[in-house]
Amino acid sequence: TFIVAGHETTALTLAWALYLCAFDPRVQERAAAEARGVLGGRVARPDDIPAMPYIARVVNETLRLYPPAAFLSRTALAADQLCGREVRRGDTIMLPIYALHRNHVLWDRPDSFDPDRFETTPDRYAFLPFGAGPRICIGAGFAMQEAIIVLSTLLARFRFEAIPGRAPEPRLILTLRPHGGVWLNVTPRLRVAE
């Protein structure tokens, strides 16, 4: 099912998003204010998503900086040329999504966490967290919904702070994982009357 197939990638996206928010309190507070304004103390639902565009941008920016599928591979269906190199039918082409998402030609300040860069739609080949074309991740829409719902609910209810000396190191083991986990201090926010 979609839920089982996408649980790891969504969990990784949420871990990286909380890590990034913990290191940028301005982003975290803006996202939390948006979530609290929409949710009013309850858990987010799918119909809340359109009212939380900033949190959607936080998720997209997280996927840009830490795409769970950091590499894509495709098999050439026909002979061609790619960047001046011959490609034979049957060759495997590896596309480094992590590098693409941090390319200075495609992105302004590519190593910076800036959710507002998604106020406009990026070039369709510059942002590929779910792949592209006929092999795009079939669960992309569900994954985005799930990430926005969980992240908004968490940020509305809790404050996340970085623990000095515990920054995770990205490691690629099928998916891009935070080696050693994501360690954060979590404190409850004051509850909004439900």
Identify the role of each PLM range.
Residues 88-89:
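Residue-level recognition of short, solvent-exposed, well-ordered loop/turn junctions
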Residues 36-41, 136, 141-194:
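Cytochrome P450 proximal C-terminal region
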Residues 95-121:
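Conserved cytochrome P450 K-helix/beta-meander segment immediately N-terminal to the heme-binding cysteine loop
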Residues 1-13, 47, 52, 75:
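Conserved cytochrome P450 catalytic core segment spanning the I/J/K helices
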Residues 9-34, 140-158:
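Cytochrome P450 catalytic-core helices
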Residues 42-83, 104:
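Conserved cytochrome P450 K-helix E-x-x-R motif and the immediately C-terminal K′/meander segment
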